[in-house]
Design a protein with these regions (language model features):
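Short, high-confidence coil segments that cap the C-terminus of an alpha-helix
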Residues: 46, 91, 119-122, 212
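Conserved core of the sugar-phosphate nucleotidyltransferase
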Residues: 104-194
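Conserved alpha/beta core of the MobA/IspD/sugar-nucleotide pyrophosphorylase nucleotidyltransferase superfamily
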Residues: 2, 91, 169-250
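Residues that recognize and position ribonucleotide moieties
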Residues: 17, 95, 102, 144, ...
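Short phosphate-binding loop-to-helix
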Residues: 50, 56-114
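N-terminal glycine-rich phosphate-binding loop and ensuing alpha1 helix
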Residues: 2-52
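A conserved hydrophobic position in a structured secondary element of the catalytic/binding core
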Residues: 53-54, 104, 180, 227
Length: 250
C-alpha cells in the first residue's frame, strides 16, 4: 500500500441548528459544499476527496463538484462522520475539512497532509493562528495552549491563558481543521464522549482526555466560516480575495 495515501473528507450534515441546509446554501452562485470540494482538490495532495453526509441532495452536489459522496448515519461530531466514511477505505492519513469554509486555504490542507506524511508517529494534528487580547473573552473563538513541543495542552472557549501577566504570542486561536493517521481516527471514533468535550462543545477534547498527542501547527492563512446566513457576504468576499491571489473561486 502507498505509504503516502491521504484522503480529504468533508463532513456535511443537513440539519444545522442555526442554518438548516447550510452545505447547499448558494455562495457566489454555487452550493457551499462545491466550493469546499474545489479547495480540497486544489490542494493537490489527496488521493481522493470525499463528502460524508446524511443527505442525498448534498451527496448529489458533492458528486457534481468532483467529490466522492459517502452517505453516513447519525454521528456525534464531524470527525466521527469522517471516521464512518473512511473506515473500510484504503488510506494512511485523513484530513477533516470543515464543510462551512468555502474559501479554506488549500495550503492549510497541504500543511496537515504533509506533516502527517512526514511524521507517521504523530496521531493527530490541527492548526492555529496568533490571537488578540480581544479573542480571549469571545466564546465563539476557541483558544489553544500548547507545550514546548507544540502539542496541545487544552482548548477552550474561555480565556486561556488567563492574562494575569500577559506576554506576546501567548494567545493562539484554533483553526478547526484536523488531520489524523487513519488508525488514530478510528480509535478517536471508538471512544465515548467525555465530560470535557460536552462541557465546551469541542470534539478535540476527547482526544486530549484519552491521552492522544495533538500537534498544533501554524496555519498558513486564515479562513472564514459560515455559521449563520449573515456570514455569506463575508464568505463571498473571501472567495473573491482567494481568486485575486491566484486561487479558483469559480
Amino acid at each position: 500500500m502507498d505509504r503516502n495515501r491521504a484522503l480529504a473528507v468533508i463532513p456535511a450534515r443537513y440539519a444545522s441548528t442555526r442554518f438548516p441546509g447550510k452545505p447547499l446554501a448558494p455562495i457566489a452562485g454555487r452550493p457551499m459544499v462545491a466550493h469546499v470540494v474545489e479547495r480540497a482538490l486544489e490542494a493537490g495532495c489527496f488521493a481522493a476527496v470525499l463528502v460524508a453526509t446524511d443527505d442525498e441532495r448534498i451527496a448529489r452536489a458533492a458528486a457534481d463538484a468532483g467529490a466522492r459522496p459517502v452517505i453516513t448515519g447519525e454521528c456525534r461530531s464531524g470527525s466521527d462522520r469522517v471516521a464512518a466514511a473512511i473506515r473500510d477505505l484504503d488510506a494512511d492519513t485523513v484530513v477533516n475539512v470543515q464543510g462551512d469554509e468555502p474559501a479554506v486555504p488549500p495550503q492549510n490542507l497541504r500543511l496537515l497532509a504533509e506533516f502527517l506524511r512526514a511524521h507517521p508517529d504523530a496521531p493527530m494534528a490541527t492548526l492555529a493562528l496568533p490571537g488578540s487580547p480581544a479573542d480571549l473573552d469571545n466564546p465563539n473563538i476557541v483558544k489553544v495552549v500548547c507545550d514546548l513541543a507544540g502539542r496541545a495542552l487544552y482548548f477552550s472557549r474561555a480565556a486561556i491563558p488567563y492574562p494575569r501577566n500577559p506576554a506576546p504570542g501567548l494567545v493562539r486561536r484554533h483553526v478547526g481543521l484536523y488531520g489524523f493517521q487513519k488508525a488514530a481516527l478510528l480509535a478517536f471514533a471508538s471512544w465515548e464522549e467525555t465530560d470535557l468535550e460536552r462541557a465546551e462543545g469541542l470534539e478535540q477534547l476527547r482526544a486530549l482526555a484519552h491521552g492522544m498527542a495533538l500537534h498544533v501547527l501554524d496555519a498558513a492563512a486564515d479562513s472564514v466560516a459560515v455559521d449563520v446566513p449573515a456570514d455569506v457576504p463575508r464568505a463571498e468576499a473571501a472567495l473573491a480575495a482567494l481568486a485575486s491571489r491566484g486561487g479558483s473561486a469559480s
